[in-house]
Amino acid sequence: MISILHTADWHLGQSFFGYDRTDEHLHFLDWLCDTIRQHEVDVLIIAGDVFDVSNPSAASQRMFYRFVSRVTTENPALQLVVVAGNHDSAARLEAPLPLLQEMRTEIKGVVPKREGKPLYDDLIVELKNARGEVEALCLAVPFLRQGDYVVPEGAENTYAAGVRMFYQELVQCAALRQTEIQALVAVGHL
């Protein structure tokens, strides 16, 4: 059975009322590496807000990329799935994707589109167990911004209705790929 560890809202680079939280973040990342190794986690999910601001410092970015390098080196079968949150710059988060994919890391920062319509299939990530078998499909949805979703006519709460419709259509797309033994894991930053 696949083992998944879900995290979110790391806010690397944050200061709290003038207090620099770098040491806290470093301790958290060390703890997370140890936990992943001890529990033989197959997939680490980061559901948005990796960074505290859309233009994170070089030190914050270095902290994140060192973590990715370390955790994937120490755990050769580990997959990472990262979605952008409202604090993250979607494009900045996706920029090093070709390098990160070499470390079994998928990042979904923006909703890919063709002719204005979401390419739902591009938001689906296969999750594999330690034997390399696909046990689940991850519906990896970054923070949805206006323009990422269609608002149904007559919707009272346009954001809620649009997001609901987006997820419904994504699930329908995933169901076409899903086998009877694969789970669906929906991940988003709302």
How should these model regions be labeled?
Residues 1-69, 76-77:
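N-terminal active-site segment of His-dependent metallophosphoesterases
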Residues 7-8, 44-48, 79-86, 108-111, ...:
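Active-site neighborhood of phospho(di)ester-bond hydrolases with catalytic His/Asp-centered motifs
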Residues 17, 50-68, 84-103, 108-109, ...:
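Metal-dependent catalytic neighborhoods of phosphoester/phosphodiester hydrolases
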Residues 19-22, 31, 67-70, 146, ...:
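Generic signature of intrinsically disordered, low-complexity segments enriched in small/polar residues
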Residues 33-37, 69, 73, 98, ...:
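Surface-exposed alpha-helical segments enriched in charged/polar residues
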Residues 54, 74-75, 83, 120-123, ...:
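Cofactor- and metal-binding active-site motifs of prokaryotic enzymes
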Residues 73-79, 182:
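A short helix->loop->beta-strand "cap" motif at the edges of active sites that frequently abuts
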Residues 88-190:
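His/Asp/Glu-rich metal-coordinating catalytic cores
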